[in-house]
């Protein structure tokens, strides 16, 4: 059990590092965010099953709802940016450029 939690935590850390390293493309950032949400869902599911508390059972469902909303908004933003600028480079979105 402890090894599974360690692997899931490492997956979250690698997704976070991927978000920080591959931030030039919006699609890769969205994929890393989805990986982070998936690991959060798995961790909260394991925690709620181990705690045997009725209060903890809806928390994984709430995280799934947030993940679905994040995916929908992210894909809508990706479509809008690619239609407007022709690519998914994040540098095009910087408003501080002269």
Curated annotation (Swiss-Prot):
Give the quaternary structure: Core subunit of respiratory chain NADH dehydrogenase (Complex I) which is composed of 45 different subunits.
Q: Where in the cell is it found?
A: Mitochondrion inner membrane
Phylogenetic classification of the source organism? Eukaryota, Metazoa, Chordata, Craniata, Vertebrata
Q: Which reaction does it catalyse?
A: a ubiquinone + NADH + 5 H(+)(in) = a ubiquinol + NAD(+) + 4 H(+)(out)
The kind of enzyme this is, by top-level EC class, is translocase
* Role description: Core subunit of the mitochondrial membrane respiratory chain NADH dehydrogenase (Complex I) which catalyzes electron transfer from NADH through the respiratory chain, using ubiquinone as an electron acceptor. Part of the enzyme membrane arm which is embedded in the lipid bilayer and involved in proton translocation.
Tell whether Electron transport is among the UniProt keywords.
yes
Question: Taking the first listed entry, what is the main subcellular location of this protein, grouped into a coarse class?
Answer: mitochondrion
Keywords tagged on the record:
Electron transport, Membrane, Mitochondrion, Mitochondrion inner membrane, NAD, Respiratory chain, Translocase, Transmembrane, Transmembrane helix, Transport, Ubiquinone
Q: InterPro entries per the record?
A: NADH_UbQ_OxRdtase_chain4L/K, NUOK/Mnh_C1-like
Q: How does it sit in the membrane?
A: Multi-pass membrane protein
One Gene Ontology CC term in the entry: mitochondrial inner membrane
Q: Does the keyword Oxidoreductase apply?
A: no
Listed GO MF terms:
NADH dehydrogenase (ubiquinone) activity
What Enzyme Commission number(s) apply to this enzyme?
Answer: 7.1.1.2
Which PANTHER family does this entry report, sorted A to Z?
NADH-UBIQUINONE OXIDOREDUCTASE CHAIN 4L (PTHR11434:SF0), NADH-UBIQUINONE OXIDOREDUCTASE SUBUNIT ND4L (PTHR11434)
Record organism: Phodopus sungorus (Striped hairy-footed hamster)
The record's annotation in Pfam families points to: Oxidored_q2
The alphabetized list of GO BP terms reads: ATP synthesis coupled electron transport
| TM regions (residue ranges) | 2-22, 26-46, 59-79
State the family it belongs to: Belongs to the complex I subunit 4L family.
What name has this protein been given in UniProt? NADH-ubiquinone oxidoreductase chain 4L
């Amino acid at each position: 059990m402890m090894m599974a939690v360690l692997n899931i935590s490492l997956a979250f850390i690698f997704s976070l590092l991927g978000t920080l390293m591959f931030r030039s493309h919006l699609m890769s950032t969205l994929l890393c965010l989805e990986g982070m949400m998936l690991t959060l869902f798995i961790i909260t599911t394991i925690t709620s099953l181990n705690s045997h508390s009725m209060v903890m059972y809806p928390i994984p469902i709430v995280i799934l709802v947030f993940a679905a909303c994040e995916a929908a908004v992210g894909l809508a933003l990706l479509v809008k940016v690619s239609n407007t600028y022709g690519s998914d480079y994040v540098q095009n979105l910087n408003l501080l450029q002269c």
